[in-house]
């Protein structure tokens, strides 16, 4: 029942007070089970059917799908339940206590993006869900901040095919219809150590890596020449060499060298295509030094994403907001949800607050976000 639902600010406060940090380091990583239980209970109180889905390969992480209404199509509102870790020394407030000051709501996850669920729940007070002509789905995912395992697994396993979806990441209520992807790899070269006084008796991994880097930089130039998407501020795929390490002493032939690099592909470029281009670029080194060079993923890859600019979802949201859709360089779960239905990224708060100490969401977003959620539910589930 709606009267069992706490006030908006108390929902928000409870979400922020429930830690759900995602981290690759096991000591920092936390289950989101308590947060999922909170959300599940609230949506059940509103009459939703709730399914909780364990996410394989994670440390006790879960997705939640709340659904109401019958038939095909409908609207999916999605978001992630986890946050990044926090630097205790840089926060001036308790990250897990929602505090309001000077028109801002402070706390870990206020903008990115636990708050979106508080907005959805509050908006549902003013909607008679018994009169929906199409179903409404609420998806809460796990591990977005690390592997995006929750959204990946949900997209792979669900039979759900809504008419459209909105992911409530902090976009300052500016609709986003496309973003680049992200691929990160480790290039590892195994040489053969030896005394530096006799270089011919070893294989210097740093020298081989120097050769490999030359070919990788040629690939970077080729990507810039071949692929363009003018709507992006950087309108081509970027390739960055981010970290390198090799050797242990000046008088030893280097036996191992490791390079970490990333590529941010444009929408429409497939991961197989990019991996093929990288393998082709490194082929001369591999042929010359068989068995000495390997390429390994550092993190699961994220493809680029694009919602067709002429889709009804884009037209409706642009009309409701009086704003054109944008493209951005950061990544979200949209590529995975987009495999189910056309998807936009749109939510309250600024992306500039994501992953920052003293994270906050400005209270000026409260009223327009609530109104927008009501409007999109009316449009896609009542008509």
Swiss-Prot record:
* Listed pathway(s): Amino-acid biosynthesis; L-arginine biosynthesis; L-ornithine from N(2)-acetyl-L-ornithine (linear): step 1/1
The organism of origin for this protein: Shigella boydii serotype 4 (strain Sb227)
* Family affiliation: Belongs to the peptidase M20A family. ArgE subfamily.
Q: Which Gene Ontology BP terms does the record give?
A: L-arginine biosynthetic process
The residues annotated as the active site are 82, 144
Under what name is this protein listed? Answer: Acetylornithine deacetylase
Q: What class of enzyme is it?
A: hydrolase
Q: Where does this protein hold Zn(2+) 1?
A: 80, 112, 169
Does Amino-acid biosynthesis show up as a keyword for this record? yes
Gene from which the chain derives: argE
């Amino acid at each position: 029942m709606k009267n069992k639902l706490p006030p908006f600010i108390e929902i928000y406060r409870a979400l922020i007070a429930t830690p759900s940090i995602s981290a690759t380091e096991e000591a920092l990583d936390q289950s989101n089970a308590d947060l999922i239980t909170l959300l599940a209970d609230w949506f059940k109180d509103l009459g939703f059917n709730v399914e909780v889905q364990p996410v394989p390969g994670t440390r006790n992480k879960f997705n939640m799908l709340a659904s109401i209404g019958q038939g095909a199509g409908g609207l999916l509102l999605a978001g992630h339940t986890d946050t990044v870790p926090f630097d205790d020394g840089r926060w001036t407030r308790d990250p897990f206590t929602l505090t309001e000051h000077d028109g801002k709501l402070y706390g870990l996850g206020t903008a990115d993006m636990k708050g979106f669920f508080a907005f959805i729940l509050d908006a549902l007070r003013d909607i008679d869900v018994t009169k929906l002509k199409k179903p409404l789905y609420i998806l809460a995912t796990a591990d977005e901040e690390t592997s995006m395992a929750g959204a990946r697994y949900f997209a792979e396993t669900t039979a759900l095919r809504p008419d459209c979806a909105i992911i409530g990441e902090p976009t300052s209520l500016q609709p986003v219809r496309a973003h680049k992807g992200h691929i990160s790899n480790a290039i590892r070269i195994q040489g053969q150590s030896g005394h530096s006084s006799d270089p011919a008796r070893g294989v210097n991994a740093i020298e081989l890596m120097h050769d490999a880097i030359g070919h990788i930089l040629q690939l970077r130039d080729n990507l810039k020449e071949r692929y363009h998407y003018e709507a992006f501020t950087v309108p081509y795929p970027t390739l960055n060499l981010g970290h390198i390490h090799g050797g242990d002493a000046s008088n030893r032939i280097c036996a191992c060298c490791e390079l970490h690099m990333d590529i941010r592909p444009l929408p429409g470029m497939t991961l197989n295509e990019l991996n093929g281009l990288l393998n082709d670029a490194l082929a001369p080194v591999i042929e010359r030094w068989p068995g000495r060079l390997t390429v390994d993923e550092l993190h699961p890859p994220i493809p680029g994403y694009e919602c067709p600019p002429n889709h009804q979802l884009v037209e409706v949201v642009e009309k409701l907001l009086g704003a054109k859709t944008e493209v951005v360089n950061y990544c979200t779960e949209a590529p995975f949800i987009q495999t189910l239905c056309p998807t936009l990224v749109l939510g309250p708060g600024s992306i500039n607050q994501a992953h920052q100490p003293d994270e906050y969401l400005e209270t000026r977003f409260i009223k327009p976000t609530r109104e927008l959620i009501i409007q999109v539910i009316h449009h896609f589930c009542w008509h």
